[in-house]
Curated annotation (Swiss-Prot):
Protein family membership: Belongs to the histidinol dehydrogenase family.
Record's protein name: Histidinol dehydrogenase
Binding, substrate: S237, Q259, H262, H329, D362, E416, H421
Binding site for NAD(+): Y130, Q191, N214
Organism: Rhodospirillum rubrum (strain ATCC 11170 / ATH 1.1.1 / DSM 467 / LMG 4362 / NCIMB 8255 / S1)
GO cellular component, one term: cytosol
Cofactor note: Binds 1 zinc ion per subunit.
Disulfide-bond pairs as recorded: none
Binding site for Zn(2+): Q259, H262, D362, H421
Length: 434
């Protein structure tokens, strides 16, 4: 049974706070193991990758065999039925078009003192994409991570994916080819992150690493941050649905289960102002769990982390609760979703109206599905083009403009006790240190 809360009850505040404070991430401490793997790969390079691949993926491979050949990729693509290939192509097209609109513009102007000022954006040179392996790997995540990098102008995009016992979902390779991935390597885990960060004889290092992974991959990304950039440390998936009683309860039940089926640690929350509707949704979830293929996972998620919150008025009460949850996915299944969305500050992605299930955003809508979890939407955003770019500011002074602003720079340098700073300005104004 999910947690049931009523905003009007006397104990709501502490109960809601406990819901927010509930820890869903793995408590597994893997930092020492990961540190050893990173150090080993940094020291032994390809030999370490080969050893770990044999140990963890039960697969013997040579250094030359770490990289997928073009023929292997083409063979995998040929295995995919045309309708599925077309669906993947449509997703890639829509994702690309949306992210093209995220491209920033340069700034260039001359201010009132005659100083030229500006800002330009450039892409990182190389990015690495981690893809969880096996037959259950998600090609949609390949598109969502790779296409923004390509739109940004990343010159070299590298994908690493473990292949347990040599198995890989051919859709993953097809998505990589469609997205323009330049190199694909059959290596995973913390050792793959190490290879991307430090480089080996076979795998040249990258500048930024993105993509989801298990506790070992997450710990590895944390530890190599600073040597390379990373996107985020993703936690279990989550959805918050704000729905009125005019909805089909089965639709809302399926939306809640769309995240619950990801992981037993995922969280699905419903906020509604209709008690009878809440009851119908709960019954619909129970009915659907009887037939869902991933029922064991979804049932554990709904039982341990699910919640239904009853409020007096959705427009008045829901936004404050939403902002405290700061959900990864927010569905607004109400008559006027825009009015409600305008009052929400913290959410990774917002899905507007009764006909916009979160799952449409996972695959085909266009915006990225790599989103902040675990309340980090309070201060961070989903993956996008800017994650693969950096800005550089530009300053240009002539003799006259330096004369206009230089004296103040000299005074500030003197106040900070940095003599050479001030002299470097004063010398250009034919002045000494005063």
């Amino acid at each position: 049974m999910p947690l049931r809360l009523e905003a009007s009850s006397a104990d709501f505040a502490p109960a809601f706070a406990a819901l927010l404070a509930g820890k869903r991430e793995s408590a597994q401490d893997v930092n020492d193991v990961v540190s050893a793997i990173l150090a080993d790969v940094r020291l032994r390079g390809d030999d370490a990758l080969i050893d770990y691949t044999a140990r963890f993926d039960k697969m013997t491979v040579s250094a030359e065999g770490l990289r997928f050949s073009d023929d292997e990729v083409d063979t995998a693509v040929a295995l995919i039925e045309p309708a599925l290939r077309d669906a993947l192509a449509l997703a890639a097209k829509r994702i690309t078009r949306f992210h093209e609109r995220q491209m920033p513009t340069a700034i260039s102007f001359t201010d009132e003192d005659g100083v030229r000022l500006g800002q330009r954006w450039t892409a990182v040179s190389a990015a690495g994409l981690y893809v969880p392996g096996g037959l259950a790997a998600y090609p949609s995540s390949v598109l969502m991570n790779a296409l923004p990098a390509k739109v940004a102008g990343v010159e070299r995009l590298v994908m690493v994916v473990p292949t347990p016992a040599g198995r890989i979902n051919p859709l993953v390779l097809a998505a990589a080819k469609l997205a323009g991935v330049d190199e694909i390597y059959r290596v995973g885990g913390a050792q793959a992150v190490a290879a991307l960060a430090y480089g080996t004889r076979t795998i040249a290092p990258v500048d930024k690493i993105v993509g989801p992974g298990n506790a070992y991959v997450a710990a590895a990304k944390r530890q190599v941050f600073g040597t390379v950039g990373i996107d985020m440390i993703a936690g279990p998936s989550e959805i918050l649905v704000v729905a009125d009683g005019a909805n089909d309860p089965d639709w809302i039940a399926l939306d809640l289960l769309s995240q619950a089926e990801h992981d037993a640690a995922a969280q699905s929350i419903l906020i509604t102002d209709d008690r009878a509707f809440a009851d119908r949704v709960e019954r619909a979830v129970t009915d659907r769990l009887r037939t869902l293929s991933r029922t064991e996972i979804a049932s554990a998620s709904w039982r341990d982390h699910g919640a239904i919150i009853l409020v007096g008025d959705l427009l008045r009460d829901a936004p404050a609760l939403v902002d405290k949850v700061a959900p990864e996915h927010l569905e607004l299944a109400v008559a006027d979703p825009d009015a409600l969305a305008a009052r929400v500050r913290h959410a990774g992605a917002i899905f507007l109206g009764r006909y916009t299930p979160e799952a449409i955003g996972d695959y085909i809508a266009g915006p990225n599905h790599v989103l902040p979890t675990s309340r980090t939407a309070r201060f961070s955003s989903g993956l996008g083009v800017l994650d693969f770019m950096k800005r550089t500011t530009l300053v240009g002074c002539g003799a006259e403009s330096l004369g206009a602003i230089g004296p103040s720079a000299v005074r500030l340098a003197r106040a900070e006790g940095l003599e050479a700073h001030g002299l470097s300005v004063a010398a250009r104004m034919n002045r000494g240190w005063e």
